């Protein structure tokens, strides 16, 4: 599509540029052609054309930029997946667990999976009842569970394994935000946020990972947030849990490769801006062109695309978040974080 679900944004412009000007299959041959023409022209006349030389330099810089971008993307993709492929993925046979699947991002993920595989085995884990009707003939299994209760979570995992099977895909999506300052929030607010957003994903991963490691096959998706990079006001506990989720993701990536010797177990991390869900029913008031309020299906589709690709990755939405993450990783860059928070 020419535009995104969010309308005309910087991501749309970036996609246009990436598919045209910054496409190395176009820019490199073009720059090479200009170089050949320039060499022949200068050789024949013994003179150089300033305007032509300027165009040639610009074409060379664009070609170089496109080559660097493509090379970086290539290295990021394969290093994140341990330079291995897994051709055994079959979503008619996989068992997918989605926490927080009764609405929002979780529902969108399930919807996009069913659009590709109507008979996919999907386990929905949520404390709230389903806000949608499962399609007739679909293999949707709903389990009600309070993920803040470790005993209930342990029982849940046993039930899933005995009634459905060992999951091969785990989507840690469930999350809450209480919306209080550090000083105003109660002990209960902090505990609920940390248990739901960080401890539950950690324990669920711990429960289902052994089967994935034994078979060297699986995919864990962690739904993160830009707040782990640029923490906004009033959700310090939420931001801390999302930063912890990112740390778990990165540490597990190393453990899978070097300790468990399961290089084909994939991981995907989503770094998302504000998304129009029950968690964010309001417009945060950020500049739409740079930081649009994301459509829930943009997020769900991106996650499902990653699952069906057979490769793990880090998803940045809006795309500008990748640049923000690179800059904000420098803890001395307080000006950037303050500016983004103020906006």
Residue ranges: model-predicted function:
Residues 205, 241:
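Active-site helix of classical SDR
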Residues 225:
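Residue(s) in the substrate-gating loop at a strand-loop-helix junction
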Residues 99, 165-175, 197, 222, ...:
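Rossmann-fold scaffold of SDR-type NAD(P)-dependent oxidoreductases
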Residues 176, 183-202, 217, 245:
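Catalytic Tyr-X3-Lys loop
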Residues 136-150:
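Rossmann-fold cofactor-recognition segment
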Residues 256-319:
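SDR active-site lid
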